UniProtKB/Swiss-Prot annotation:
Belongs to the bacterial ribosomal protein bS16 family. InterPro entries: Ribosomal_bS16, Ribosomal_bS16_CS, Ribosomal_bS16_dom_sf. The keyword Lipoprotein does not apply. Coiled coil: none annotated. GO terms for molecular function: structural constituent of ribosome. GO terms for cellular component: chloroplast; mitochondrion; small ribosomal subunit. GO terms for biological process: mitochondrial translation. It comes from Mesostigma viride (Green alga). This is Small ribosomal subunit protein bS16c. HAMAP family: Ribosomal_bS16. It comes from the Eukaryota. Transmembrane segments: none annotated.
């Protein structure tokens, strides 16, 4: 099963995350199928590749809790429901 989750980058005490599509059996920082954006909690910046995220969600991908919250803030689920 494919999951949309965060992959940690950055240095100690300065996290930076990439939103990725990955097989659920792989480890957190394993090889991603596709990178779909980034999230910087320190600066409060988020950039998402919405068309590819919608593609993976339509294909049955599950989101982690944190990525789900990010997608709700970016109103991706609203766009997904409008497309159906």
């Amino acid at each position: 099963m494919v999951k949309l989750r965060l992959k940690r980058y950055g240095r100690k005490k300065r996290p930076f995350y990439r939103v990725i599509a990955i097989d659920s059996r792989c480890r957190r920082d394993g090889k991603a199928l596709k990178e779909l954006g980034f999230y910087d909690p320190i600066a409060g910046k988020t950039q998402l590749d919405v068309p590819n995220i919608i593609f993976y969600l339509k294909a049955g991908a599950q989101t982690s809790e944190t990525v789900g919250n990010l997608l709700q803030k970016a109103k991706v689920f609203n766009q997904l429901s409008l497309l159906n």
